[in-house]
């Protein structure tokens, strides 16, 4: 299995966006620059807005909410808003100005065997306990899938021990050998390899079949 240290925790995440709507969200000035959002009706009178936000444009207040949600959802999560390195963008689900779900997404070119493929890697998908089992995570995964299609991304990949949510969304286990860069607390430790991570899941977006061969993540584990 994993030759990486305990600190190398496989995580999953997701996101996506469809219709573009402006930058303002309940007057939150912490969201500077390009933000896209989709209003989502909930059972009651309230609505959850799903936003796609570039990581660099997330302001301090919202970043603190992200960190608090991650620490609440993942026991032992470090005291920052990302596990290894910040993702490129996130999907944020906001209800009444409060962050209720989030998913990080990284644009990563990886090599599988001799084939170089363009992927979105999903990390740290999580939903506030009180909001679970209402399809929110599934919705974020559907959004990132839609974005991947519109961006010509070949695959959306993630690492998950529990595959239920993802199998339902069209992901499948992939048993390729895998290698990645071990990073712990901003220090590069070396290279990790696994014959089969047991947790890699892949969703095909385009016409290309998932290749045979070793997966070289060309970076850290998602
Ligand atoms: C996993 C999680 C994001 C699901 O969010 P959600 O909004 O409740 O998801 P959905 O409503 O779209 O789907 C719920 C289904 O996901 C599946 N599921 C539950 N926990 C899961 C988990 N940890 N991993 C994968 N699938 C899970 C179940 O089949 C569940 O169905 P149920 O509600 O009938 O039991 C949420 O439970 C969570 O934040 N867990 C803690 C963090 C975590 O484990 N994230 C996943 C990292 S890979």
List each language-model region with its residue ranges.
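Conserved N-terminal entry element of GNAT/NAT acetyltransferase domains
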Residues: 2-4, 11-14, 26-60, 218-221
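A conserved beta-strand-loop-helix scaffold within acyl/acetyltransferase catalytic domains
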Residues: 53-126
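Conserved active-site alpha-helix within GNAT-family acetyltransferase domains
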Residues: 150-154, 160-186
